[in-house]
Amino acid sequence: MGIQGFLQKLSGLLLLLCALPWAEGGKVLVFPMEGSHWLSIRDVVRELHARGHQAVVLAPEVTVHIKEEDFFTLQTYPVPYTKEEYRHHLLGHLQNFFETEFSLKLVLQTMAAVNNVSTFYVRSCRGLLHNTALIQSLNSSSFDVVLTDPFFPCGAVLAMYLRVPAVFFLQSMLCELEFEATNSPNPSSYIPRLLTLNSDHMSFLDRVKNMLYPVPWMYLCHVNYGSLARLASDLLQREVSVVEILRHASVWLLRKDFVFHYPRPFMPNMVFIGGINCANRKPLSQEFEAYVNASGEHGIVVFSLGSMVSEIPEKKAMEIAEALGRIPQTLLWRYTGTRPSNLAKNTILVKWLPQNDLLGHPKARAFITHSGSHGIYEGICNGVPMVMMPLFGDQMDNAKRMETRGAGVTLNVLEMTADDLENALKTVINNKSYKENIMRLSSLHKDRPIEPLDLAVFWVEYVMRHKGAPHLRPAAHDLTWYQYHSLDVIGFLLAIVLTVVFIVYKSCAYGCRKCFGGKGRVKKSHKSKTH
């Protein structure tokens, strides 16, 4: 362990020791989201359990990834759909991103897919909030904090109803509602909007696009979150908006870091924990250690399109397999679909792989990823250059940011050929600049006084100890939109200026009439007398 690692461990230990007088074991209600969202919040739950806290994870009976484990109590509630229906609506739309060229049709399909998934979350939330017995049981359990992912903020509604402080754990939200809810400054002049693929240095036309692009997505958010707002209003017996629900958060734990995201202002209750999923790196199992050792001097390439992609269209899978067979490295490909008939000997298909552990191995040469934030951070943490094949959502923006930093190459999964993938892999493996750039990002990312996991746990315990964090809440929440932008002050000052100008103008006009108007009349009367 180097001195930097020792200091990080020491700072984490000191932070823990400082918290010990107050950390007598609290009760944490966890309301996670599905998929990779659960995988990182799960590490926080495990660490809270290790520090003596009792965690209850609340989840629907029908889930894909959330399973009972020994470091938390799983509390489920019935929902009005089957696992097959849920899988179809959660995962089925992904096939479109391999088959449909980018067009208005694809945009509409994407919006429809988001709406379908949101419909399932609304049904799940309704199943919870209308479960009177469960709600009463939770209310009597005296939880100290609710830890939840607000991407679909059912957990935030529950925290409001239980009158328990909430800690939000997230990467981002639809329509970037996290910035509206926290009143973070968000000018479109230099802060790129989600899905625009803009950087923080924009041309005039980029800024026009940046301002207009969010408009249709605001409509989508209004539709998607409107049902939740009505559910919340019924439960709370008063009219509430989604933004008001989100403002209940005491602290926002954001899986962000400025080595990955563009610099921008944030509020004091927004804490960066980017790279939290890199914390638990373990030794490889005998199976994977054997694969890595057999790769020889050429090393390995890790390939995963995430937990949500289970199958790729046959033609595209064969193109990928052909490209992988052309490079000397050993390919470890996480894939659960039909085995491509042209799969080369250097490519090993596995149903699951320890992605972070493999990327941390010295023989890791490249990482083929769909550009999900978890994978990107694991690539940064371990200093492995990337070939990125974004499929949907913020993955496009993630890939753009890494490409602009010279840490990877982006491919269009719809248009790429076997030659394109082969060339991209050879570029990031053989061109030393990619390795140097990703190592520089890795060094910047790791140069911090405390590990993200320790920081996340500290803030959850902080909210428990102090029953919230109202002192971090900016007064901007209490202002109307025109007060926030000082439009009333501007209007008042403008009225004063106009009044002064009007008075000066009238005074000058009156003075001119007095000075010159009388002389004119005298001259006219004198002329009339001479005639």
Swiss-Prot record:
It is found in: Endoplasmic reticulum membrane. The chain crosses the membrane at residues 489-505. Pfam families: UDPGT (PF00201). InterPro entries: UDP-glycosyltransferase, UDP_glucos_trans, UDP_glycos_trans_CS. Glycans are attached at residues 116, 139, 293, 431. Keywords: Endoplasmic reticulum, Glycoprotein, Glycosyltransferase, Lipid metabolism, Membrane, Signal, Transferase, Transmembrane, Transmembrane helix. Residues 1-25 form the signal peptide. It is an enzyme of class 2 (transferase). The keyword Transmembrane applies. It is a single-pass membrane protein. One of its GO terms (molecular function) is glucuronosyltransferase activity. GO terms for cellular component: endoplasmic reticulum; endoplasmic reticulum membrane. The keyword Plastid does not apply. One of its GO terms (biological process) is bile acid secretion. Its EC number is 2.4.1.17. Homodimers. Homooligomer. Interacts with UGT1A1, UGT1A4, UGT1A6, UGT1A7, UGT1A8, UGT1A9 and UGT1A10 to form heterodimers. UDP-glucuronosyltransferase (UGT) that catalyzes phase II biotransformation reactions in which lipophilic substrates are conjugated with glucuronic acid to increase the metabolite's water solubility, thereby facilitating excretion into either the urine or bile. Essential for the elimination and detoxification of drugs, xenobiotics and endogenous compounds. Catalyzes the glucuronidation of endogenous estrogen hormones such as estradiol and estrone. Belongs to the UDP-glycosyltransferase family. This is UDP-glucuronosyltransferase 1A3. It comes from Rattus norvegicus.
